[in-house]
Amino acid sequence: MSISNVSAAKSAYRNALRATRIAFRQDVPVLSSARLQIKDGFTKNRELKDEAEISEAISKLNEVSKFLVQNIVQGEKQEDGKYFLNFHEKTELGDNETIRQGNKANLGSLAGAKVKKCSDN
């Protein structure tokens, strides 16, 4: 493994652990489980020799980190039965602009359009 891949792998690993702390900060069992999965995956990928496979594994770990930080939101059930969502400054909040435009082409079968099935031939 090249020196650049070693440092990239270490950086990706640290970022993944940081992402789990952000995403699951108030849920210790889930936080522990997520960190264990990342550690197991990282340990398993230590056996990789091909530079392309190593780069792909690093890229996937970086994508997982980004997804955890931007898309996972923890919720707490309140006494009134409603849920309080714990958003943070890095949570990705969509503006739903494509839905407001009524652009059904981007929605595919979610737009209620008939979908051609294999059995329709």
Curated annotation (Swiss-Prot):
Gene Ontology CC: mitochondrial matrix
Transit peptide, start-end: 1-26
Naturally occurring in which organism (per UniProt): Scheffersomyces stipitis (strain ATCC 58785 / CBS 6054 / NBRC 10063 / NRRL Y-11545) (Yeast)
Lineage summary: Eukaryota, Fungi, Dikarya, Ascomycota, Saccharomycotina
Predominant localisation class: mitochondrion
Classification via Pfam families: Complex1_LYR (PF05347)
Gene that encodes the chain: MZM1
UniProtKB keywords: Chaperone, Mitochondrion, Transit peptide
Protein name: Mitochondrial zinc maintenance protein 1, mitochondrial
Any one Gene Ontology molecular-function term assigned to this protein's record: protein folding chaperone
Family according to the record: Belongs to the complex I LYR family. MZM1 subfamily.
Gene Ontology biological process: mitochondrial respiratory chain complex III assembly
InterPro entries: Complex1_LYR_dom, Complex1_LYR_LYRM7, MZM1/LYRM7
Subunit: Interacts with RIP1.
Coiled coil segments of this chain: none
Record's function text: Assembly factor required for Rieske Fe-S protein RIP1 incorporation into the cytochrome b-c1 (CIII) complex. Functions as a chaperone, binding to this subunit within the mitochondrial matrix and stabilizing it prior to its translocation and insertion into the late CIII dimeric intermediate within the mitochondrial inner membrane. Modulates the mitochondrial matrix zinc pool.
